[in-house]
Structure formats: structure tokens, C-alpha cells
A protein has these predicted regions:
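Basic, often amphipathic N-terminal segments
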Residues: 1-74, 98-158, 177-184
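Generic structural hydrophobic/aromatic packing signal, biased to beta-strands
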Residues: 4, 74-79, 90, 167-169
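Charge-rich, low-complexity N-terminal segments
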Residues: 85-87, 120
């Protein structure tokens, strides 16, 4: 299984990491907890564009073409809470034409597109995808309240504008990242 992801500009990356840290310091599940595990630097703030079961050289070539429009400007929006029992806390990436076109191009490059065996909930299907940056997973309802308070103290030095700058695929089995852009 592979995910196709885009990472943030340096300032946005630092801001999200400060939020991860604030959550961890407040005792709330946070993506910061992955920093010390085997993923190391591969644990980066990112937006997942698609999931796929396999990526052969032909598909990787199509993906490289699909992400050719990077960098893409973004606005990082408010907090999102997904789930009903255990929650995912995330920051919205406000949809714009460039972000939606990038995600559609990546989906079109994949052989299984929105295959239900890969994307069980149709999360990445056209019109169903919600661009977001995960801050923490498996939060309780009480954790969500604590998180809101903790994140109120994490200012951003430059508004909400940023950019999606580079693309990678994450091999979930090998736990390895593969950059899809020329700088990778």
C-alpha cells in the first residue's frame, strides 16, 4: 500500500510541528509522537492526495507528471475533527482550483483510481476528498477540548498562506519515502 502526499513550505511545516508539540505537551495524542520512531524525518506534515495498492515504474512516471504543477499555493484553515468515537484532529487546507486539480491529476495517474479495495470509504473520490494536515489521531472527546485550548497558544508568524512544495509516495509496508519531484 502506498500513499501519495505533498509536503508544505518550510514556514508552514514549522507551524504544524509547533502544533504537534503543543498537543504532545498537553498530553493529547499528536503526530509528534512519530518523530522518535523508525520513520524519523519521513514523519513530515503533509496532505495525502491518494492511496494505491501498487506503484510500478510506469505509474511513478505518470505521478511525476501529475505533480509537475508544484508548488501550489494554499491557505491553511481552521481545525477539523473527523470521527465519531475516536477522533482525528486536523487543519483544513482550504480548497482552491490548483489544489483540487493536483489531487485529480494524481488520482487519474493511478491504475486503481478510487478502487474500493484501497479506499474503503471513498475518501479520495472526486467531490469527497477533504484536503487536510493531520495534527493528531485517536483523540477522545475530552482530548479534543484540551487540544483546542493547547492550540490557541500556537501563533503563526505569517498568516495562513503557504504552499504545497514537493510530492512523495510513502510505501506503508517498507516504511520508506520516495520523492516524486526532481529535487528528490
Amino acid at each position: 500500500m502506498h500513499s501519495v502526499e505533498v509536503v508544505l513550505d518550510d514556514e508552514s511545516d514549522r507551524w504544524i510541528r509547533r502544533q504537534w508539540t503543543a498537543l504532545a505537551e498537553a498530553g493529547v495524542p499528536s503526530q509528534a509522537r512519530h518523530s522518535a520512531d523508525s520513520r524519523g524525518e519521513s514523519n513530515r506534515p503533509h496532505v495525502t492526495l491518494a492511496l494505491t495498492s501498487q506503484i510500478d515504474p510506469e505509474v511513478e512516471s505518470r505521478l511525476r507528471d501529475a505533480v509537475g504543477a508544484l508548488p501550489v499555493p494554499i491557505t491553511i484553515g481552521g481545525l477539523l475533527v473527523f470521527g465519531s468515537t475516536r477522533f482525528v484532529l486536523a487543519r483544513l487546507v482550504v480548497p482552491n482550483a490548483a489544489v483540487l486539480a493536483l489531487q485529480a491529476a494524481v488520482m487519474a495517474a493511478l491504475p486503481d483510481g478510487a478502487d474500493a479495495t484501497v479506499d474503503r470509504h471513498g475518501t479520495f473520490a472526486p467531490g469527497r476528498w477533504t484536503a487536510h494536515i493531520t495534527l493528531g489521531r485517536r483523540l477522545t472527546a475530552a482530548d479534543v477540548g484540551t487540544a483546542m485550548h493547547a492550540l490557541a497558544g500556537v501563533p503563526r508568524s505569517r498568516g495562513a498562506d503557504g504552499a504545497l512544495t514537493r510530492a512523495r509516495r510513502w510505501d506503508m509496508v517498507a516504511k520508506r519515502e520516495h520523492w516524486l519531484d526532481p529535487a528528490g
